Amino acid sequence: MATSHEDGSATHPNYYYYVDPSLPVYESQQPNPVDDLITIYGLEEVARQVARTNADGTKAVKLRKSYKNQIQDLSGRFITIPSRENGKGGEISDVIFQNNPDMMNQAKLVEGMSEEEYRDAMMKRDTGLFEPPQMDWDMCSTVIGQLMKSHPSEFKNSGFDVDDLAFDLNGTGTKTKKRKYKSNGSSMASPNTELQPDDMKRRRLE
């Protein structure tokens, strides 16, 4: 059935102002973006673990979990094992042993060297980190052997000094003296002044 205007100048089909019935029927998107997608996909527990606030409105104590923390509950381990191939191996040795790469025995793959020879050279370079003069095992044994469960005041009586565990960053073997600060009467301390109790109180008030 057609619909015509009052002037009769034009005639249009019934669906002119609506939807063409010959076209496919429109289907709404599923699931609807305005629906509760967390409930639909069963993510309530995950959402609770990463929520910034608790259900009662209080601030959550734990930090939001990263992807690595999320998968810790799964069986198996998903941690990359450090190795030379992935570039994650040997990064901490320079920190622990204070080795300058230029002073370490270098193992280079030269022409004519077999794969086994190169592997042996790399092994010798790594084991050299734990041999004298890189490591003083006698000193380590003495210091670590004194770390027994006891009152802190007993450490010095047994010959233990906490400075023995410190790194000799300047390579001189001497202790660095800390600069003392003296108060000049102001609430702000200069490098040549020492903080007094009154100064600390002023800083707290400020």
UniProtKB/Swiss-Prot annotation:
Primary residence: nucleus
Biased segments, Polar residues type: 183-195
Swiss-Prot/TrEMBL GO biological process terms: regulation of transcription by RNA polymerase II
InterPro entries: Mediator_Med19_fun
Single GO MF descriptor: transcription coregulator activity
Matching PANTHER family: MEDIATOR OF RNA POLYMERASE II TRANSCRIPTION SUBUNIT 19 (PTHR28270:SF1)
Protein name according to UniProt: Mediator of RNA polymerase II transcription subunit 19
Organism: Kluyveromyces lactis (strain ATCC 8585 / CBS 2359 / DSM 70799 / NBRC 1267 / NRRL Y-1140 / WM37) (Yeast)
Gene (name only): ROX3
